[in-house]
C-alpha cells in the first residue's frame, strides 16, 4: 500500500515538473511559438520568423509559408484550444489562420516525419507537403478485414 502511494505521489510530482512539450515537433493546445522558435523533425523546420512569416523548411529550402512576411515584426504562432492555428501580430491581431477553429478541446500541431504539418484532435488542417504514402496500407487488405474503415487501397503504377 505504501509503495503504491509512493508511486502515485512520484507520478504526480513528475507530472508537475515535467515540461509540457516533451517533443521538438509538437505544439500543444494553448502553446505558442514566438519569433525565432520552431518545431523540428530531422532536416525539417517549421519556424516563426522575425518578419512574421511562418515557414516550413526542408534543410534550407522553403517548402510552405503563410506569406505573411513583412506584415509586421515579432509575431507569434498560437495553437488555440479550439483547434485553430493562428499567427498573431504583437497587438494580438490575427494575420493568418488555418481556419480550423471549432469545439474547444485538446489539439496538437505536429511536424511529422513525412514533412507534413498536421493539426490533430480530428484531422483539421495540413500543409499538404508530405513526401510519402502515409496512412495507406502497405499490402492489400486481408479477407478477414476486407476494408480498412475509410482507407482506400491505392497501388503505385
Swiss-Prot record:
Coiled-coil features, chain-numbered ranges: none
Tell me the keywords, alphabetical order.
Antiviral protein, Disulfide bond, Lectin, Mannose-binding, Plant defense, Secreted, Signal
Gene3D superfamilies xref list: Bulb-type lectin domain
The entry's alpha-D-mannopyranose-binding residues are 49, 51, 53, 57, 60-61, 64-65, 67, 80, 82, 84, 88, 95-96, 99, 106, 112, 114, 116, 120, 125
User: Could you tell me which PROSITE patterns the record lists for this protein?
Assistant: BULB_LECTIN
UniProt cross-references to SMART domains, sorted A to Z = B_lectin (SM00108)
State the signal peptide span: 1-19
Propeptide feature ranges: 129-157
The way this protein is applied in practice is:
Can be used as a chimeric variant with insecticidal venom toxins to obtain biological insecticide candidates. This lectin has receptors on insect midgut and this allows its internalization into insects hemolymph. In an other hand, scorpion and spiders toxins are naturally not toxic when administered orally to insect larvae, but a fusion with this lectin makes them toxic for the larvae that would eat them.
Q: What is this protein called?
A: Mannose-specific lectin
Taxonomic source organism: Galanthus nivalis
